[in-house]
């Protein structure tokens, strides 16, 4: 289901637990050896949920939050493909490797295509995460060769390694 403001605390807790710190090490998506600090904040998730161009989708088992994913619709430029950016994609580390992420990503793509008529999905992945890049490649995403420096945000996170970079991956949807 789509997230609402009442879900913010649970989303922030799950995202930070899955990406950073010791709790993230039980899953394969940890960034604990790459980054210190938080992955997200209450303010960021509230802003995303409140935005009309964003969907935060939740995966629940009864009331247990298993995963979430954020889709942000890019403003369409004349004759360009309509694009949705995927981010803050997470599955509880204790529940990973059970197909939840595959199903959540597929449902997010389906929903974005239905609601926004999306023709291309984009995301940014840390270049030193080959296992994560491979996961997305198996789902039809391709490396674009577009690489950028990892963003600096010392109030929230701090890189443990110098020279971190992000690569843009994309998936074009045939109509």
What are these regions (language model features)?
Residues 103-120, 142:
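Conserved acyl-CoA
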Residues 39-57, 162-165:
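A short helix-loop-beta-strand connector motif used in the catalytic cores of GNAT acetyltransferases and
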Residues 58, 89-97, 125-126:
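A short, internal acetyl-CoA/4′-phosphopantetheine-binding micro-motif in the GNAT/acyltransferase core
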Residues 58, 64-73, 85-90:
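Conserved beta-strand in the GNAT
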Residues 16-45:
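Conserved GNAT-fold acetyl-CoA-binding loop/helix
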Residues 119-175:
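C-terminal "cap" of GNAT-fold acetyltransferases
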Residues 1-13, 20-21:
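A short beta-loop-alpha structural element at the N-terminal edge
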Residues 91, 97-110, 134, 138:
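Conserved acetyl-CoA-binding loop-helix of GNAT-fold acetyltransferases
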């Amino acid at each position: 289901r789509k997230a609402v403001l009442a879900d913010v605390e649970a989303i922030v807790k799950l995202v930070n637990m899955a990406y950073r710190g010791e709790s993230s090490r039980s899953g394969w998506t940890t960034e604990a050896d790459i980054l210190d600090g938080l992955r997200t904040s209450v303010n960021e998730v509230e802003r995303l949920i409140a935005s009309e161009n964003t969907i935060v989708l939740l995966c629940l088992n009864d009331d247990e939050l298993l995963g979430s994913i954020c889709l942000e619709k890019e403003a369409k430029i004349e004759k360009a493909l309509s694009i949705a950016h995927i981010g803050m994609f997470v599955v509880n580390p204790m529940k990973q490797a059970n197909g939840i992420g595959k199903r959540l990503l597929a449902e997010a793509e389906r929903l974005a295509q239905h609601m926004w008529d999306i023709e291309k999905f984009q995301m940014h992945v840390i270049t030193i995460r080959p296992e994560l890049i491979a996961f997305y490649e198996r789902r039809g995403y391709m490396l674009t060769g577009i690489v950028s420096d990892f963003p600096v945000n010392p109030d929230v996170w701090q890189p443990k390694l110098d020279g971190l970079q992000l690569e843009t991956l994309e998936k074009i949807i045939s109509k």
